[in-house]
Amino acid sequence: MMTPSQWKDDICTSQLAMVACAIFLLLPIFSPVVFATGLESHRNLQVPFVQPEDLGFLPQRSPQGHEFALRHIFHHGTYQYPLLHKRLDVNPETKIWVASEDGAKLEFSPHFRVSSQPSQIQRLTDRRVQVMEARLSAARTPEVFSTLSPPVWTIDELPGPNISDKTTVLNLAKMTANAYIMEPGAERWEDVSGPFNQSLSFGWEKDGLRGHIYADQTNSTIIIALKGTSAALFDGDETTTNDKINDNLFFSCCCGQGGQYFWRQVCDCYSSAYTCNSTCLVSALVTENRYYRASLDLYANVTDIYPNSTVWLAGHSLGGAVSSLLGLTYGLPVVTFEGVPEALPASRLGLPVPPGTDPNTPQAREYTGAYHFGHTADPVYMGTCNGATSFCTLAGYAMESACHTGQRCVYDTVGDLGWRVGIGTHRILNVISDVIERYEDVPTCVPDTECRDCALWKFFESNGSHPIPPSSSTTSPTRTRTSTCETPGWWGCLDKTTTTGTTTNVITTSTSTCKTPGWFGCKDPTTTSSVPSATPSPTPIITSISMPTPTSTTCETPGWFGGCNDPPTTATSKPNSSSPSTSTTCTRPGFFWGCWDPTSSSETPTAAFSSTATHTSCASKTWFGRSCTTPAPR
């Protein structure tokens, strides 16, 4: 008797029999009889689906081509007009002038050919706008978010950009370059939300997030290209001020604080050295006038116009980072060019995270459908534009993030072309003409799972009532001390210590008047005076020393370290004798000491008991009192 396997081997031998055998083997999969048996227990039965690629005799699916054209331009206000949302429809016959980020005019290409290929993305099954908004709002409140049921995740296979095709990558880059377009003409902007017509307000075009909507011929695929950071260096030109605020919110460890001197501070969440309030950071990021909030509203309005279309996202620089955050939120294919590393803000926005993934390291997440193109000479893309003398720092940008979500597609322009790292290579026009068009092939995309942002920083959470928590107080179960310091110092309090108590002390009062001060004390003879106090004390001992001959010494020129530099003066008393009196005046003193004048003397007879006195005086003394420059008149 033949076994089933032997029967199958004998039947499926010829070529015609192989086709018939394959159809027979696929019948259990496509036939409803196997699944609809009528029993309740069979309803939850899961049978693995065999992909057509796994069958060797079926052809592989080739990338499909799409031809995209500009259909709409959306503008969402962020700072001056946070409720502003306008739409400009572009007709095929509309003439559009495109200006690049550096002001150069470009010839507008009405059509862009892009190919697609299947892409696997892990995302939520329920991605309705109202459901996602509720989850994002609850994620900012841990108490509410913890009570929600776990969302249902799935890995969907949907058409995405063919990142291995050079033409596709090049045209997507051109779409992001065209996203820097100014107002294309005199067409009328329509209000998307709200009854307020703010089009008459001057300057609204320079405030907000601008996205360009491209659609293929069948409207089956939509591409949203978001505008990135303006090229102006300082404030006041285009949307540079707003872009700088968002850049420092998104890509710095703590709002541009605790780093370089020129970084623009955009919030007050810094607590101490390398310590930051993460609750304050999240609150600053999700405010309604920020770009991420504007991108969510823009996506909601685009999907309202095209509810059944597949949406792709593209962007350059800040626009690329915002596109990536939006793609992580809704599970959309994303292609960015020279995008700022966005894993850091992705970990702070409360984005939905699949089970088994660390929310603090979104760069380790798989099946994101995000691809970030860039080259090694761009310090913004590589995450190195944060030194003290870097262009970003001098312009006020705090670019501390270095990790990308999804996969990185890096052109090694430093190694292959010998480029030097510089901010000038960040512009999208340079990337298009000097990088993408110059290379024959596109680089291989790889994930960046081992990267870490802000490794030296510590982040803590607060209740959200204060941007910076008050000073903490430390209590001990064995000792409690309360003190108020009015003069804090570097290593403690500088206030004087006050002690309350009853003590009995012996009071000793010393009064001294120094007539001859020296460098390290007084040179006067020591005089001691003792005043007895009321407290009993030992009997004082007073010692008096009587000199046989009193001597009085007066020093006019004290020395540096003690002693006297005056010339010696001698007084001698001799009874029953008389001697002449001699007076000497030096008019030519020596260089160091002595006198070069001839010796002169005057004799004056005196009475008995007289003495010989010699007086030498000097008005100006130099070299520590050893020489005389100006003799004093006598």
Swiss-Prot record:
Residues the record marks as carrying a glycan: 162, 197, 219, 277, 301, 308, 463, 576
The keyword Repeat is annotated on this UniProt entry: no
Superkingdom in the source lineage: Eukaryota
Record: active site: 317 (charge relay system)
InterPro entries recorded: AB_hydrolase_fold, ATG15_Lipase
Annotated catalysed reactions: a triacylglycerol + H2O = a diacylglycerol + a fatty acid + H(+)
GO cellular component: multivesicular body membrane; vacuolar lumen
Keyword Hydrolase tagged: yes
MF terms in GO: phospholipase activity; triacylglycerol lipase activity
Protein family membership: Belongs to the AB hydrolase superfamily. Lipase family.
Subunit structure: Binds to both phosphatidylinositol (PI) and phosphatidylinositol 3,5-bisphosphate (PIP2).
Free-text function comment from the UniProt entry: Lipase which is essential for lysis of subvacuolar cytoplasm to vacuole targeted bodies and intravacuolar autophagic bodies. Involved in the lysis of intravacuolar multivesicular body (MVB) vesicles. The intravacuolar membrane disintegration by ATG15 is critical to life span extension.
Name of protein: Putative lipase ATG15
Taxonomic lineage of the native organism: Eukaryota, Fungi, Dikarya, Ascomycota, Pezizomycotina
